[in-house]
Amino acid sequence: MSKVGTSDSKNTLYCSFCGKSQHEVRKLIAGPTVFICDECVELCMDIIREENKSSLVKSRDGIPTPKEICKVLDDYVIGQNHAKKVLSVAVHNHYKRLNHQTKHNDVELAKSNILLIGPTGSGKTLLAQTLARILDVPFTMADATTLTEAGYVGEDVENIILKLLQAADYNVERAQRGIVYIDEIDKISRKSDNPSITRDVSGEGVQQALLKIMEGTVASVPPQGGRKHPQQEFLQVDTTNILFICGGAFAGLEKIISARGRSTSIGFAAQVLAPEDRRTGEIFRHVEPEDLLKYGLIPEFVGRLPVVATLEDLDEASLKKILTDPKNALVKQYQRLFEMENIELTFADEALGAVARKAIERKTGARGLRSILESILLETMFDLPGLEGVEEVVISREVVDGTARPLYIYADRSDRAAESSASA
C-alpha cells in the first residue's frame, strides 16, 4: 500500500516497495497508484548495473569489445579518455590472445604489459581496479617501494604472485589469467647512470627481479608467504598470461621530455614541447622510451612494457564531477553522514568549484579532495550532534575560501543566517 488511512497519518505517503514513509526518505516518486522512494530507485539501478556487467563479461566468449570496456570505465572514472582507449584496446587484445592461443600455432602473440604514467591523483589505480572488476579476474596490487631483491630485507617479488593466488582463492588456473598492478614503479628507477657503483637492491635490482615474472616464468610460490624454506611445498604458477600494469607519477619526467623536445626540434617542430606553462599530463603524451631510460628504468624493463598510457592533470570541471557524479562520490558520502543526524547537506556549485581549485593548487588531484572537504566540514561535524532544530547546512564558496562559516537553516525557518557571519 502507498497510503495509510489512520486518523493521524491519513495523508502520509509510503513507498510501495520498501514501505518507508515520505518522512523517512529524501524523495518519493509518484506513479499510477504506486510510489517509489529514491533508495529503492538506487537499489534497482545497482541491480541493473550488476546484470549488465555480468552479461558484458559473458559476451563474445568472455571478451568484451574495447568500446564496451571503455563504456564501463566511463561509469567509474571521470575524464582520461585517451588512457581509457589505450587500456581498453590493450586489455581486449590480451584476453583475446589467451582465448585463441591454442587454436592457431602459426603465429605466437606476445604479451603486452601496460605502463600508466600520470600525475598524483589522476586515476591510475582506479583504472586498474575497474578493469579487473569488469573482466571478473583475480586482481592484486603491489607497492614497488616495498620490494627488494631476493635475499635482502623487504618483500620478495614472488610475493606479488602469492597475493594474486590468494585473490584467486588459491585457484592456480584463475590466478594465471589475473591482473597485477604495481604502483609507484617510478620509485625503483636506477639511482645512478653507472650501474656498477653500488648494489642497488631496491632500484635496479628490483627491476631485474621483475623482468622474469613480467615476461613469463614458472614461479615457485610458498603458500604461507614470506621467505622460502627447503621443507616447504611450493605452488607452481606460470606468469606468462598474467597481465602486468605498472603505474607511477614519474615526477621530473616532464623536464626530460621537454629538454629532448628543445634539443631536437627546429623550425616548425620546435613548438611541440617548448612552452614551459604546459600541464604535466600534456607533456607526458610525448614520452618516448629514451626518456624512461634517462629517468632510470633499465632498457630490458622498458621493453617489457610496450603499451604506454598517459594520464592528464584533472581540470576543475573533472574534479567537480568526481565530487558529485560517481556512485560513491565524496559529496554523497558526507551527505549520508549528515542524514544520520537528520540534516541535509547542500553544496553550492561555486563551492564545488572552489574545492576543485584548491586541489589543483595543492597538486594532489582527486586524492586530495577528501582532506579538503574534511577540513571544511570539521567544525560543523563537531558542533552539529549537540545542536537542536538544524534542518539543513549550506556550504558556499566563501566557506571553502575560509571567509565565512557554514549556513545553518533551522526547522522553523526563522533564523536562516544564524551561522553565516564572517569568521575572524
Curated annotation (Swiss-Prot):
Cellular component terms (Gene Ontology): HslUV protease complex
GO biological process per UniProt: cell division; proteolysis involved in protein catabolic process
Residues the entry annotates as binding ATP: 119-126
PROSITE patterns in the record: CLPX_ZB (PS51902)
NCBIfam families to which the protein is assigned, alphabetical: clpX, PRK05342.1
Alphabetized GO MF terms: ATP binding; ATP hydrolysis activity; ATP-dependent protein folding chaperone; protein dimerization activity; unfolded protein binding; zinc ion binding
Protein name per UniProt: ATP-dependent Clp protease ATP-binding subunit ClpX
One Pfam family here: AAA_2
Domain of life: Bacteria
Sites where the protein binds Zn(2+): 15, 18, 37, 40
Family: Belongs to the ClpX chaperone family.
Gene3D superfamilies: 1.10.8.60, ClpX chaperone, C4-type zinc finger domain, P-loop containing nucleotide triphosphate hydrolases
Assembly description: Component of the ClpX-ClpP complex. Forms a hexameric ring that, in the presence of ATP, binds to fourteen ClpP subunits assembled into a disk-like structure with a central cavity, resembling the structure of eukaryotic proteasomes.
Function summary: ATP-dependent specificity component of the Clp protease. It directs the protease to specific substrates. Can perform chaperone functions in the absence of ClpP.
Domain ClpX-type ZB: 3-56
Keywords annotated in UniProt: ATP-binding, Chaperone, Metal-binding, Nucleotide-binding, Zinc
CDD domains named in the record: RecA-like_ClpX (cd19497)
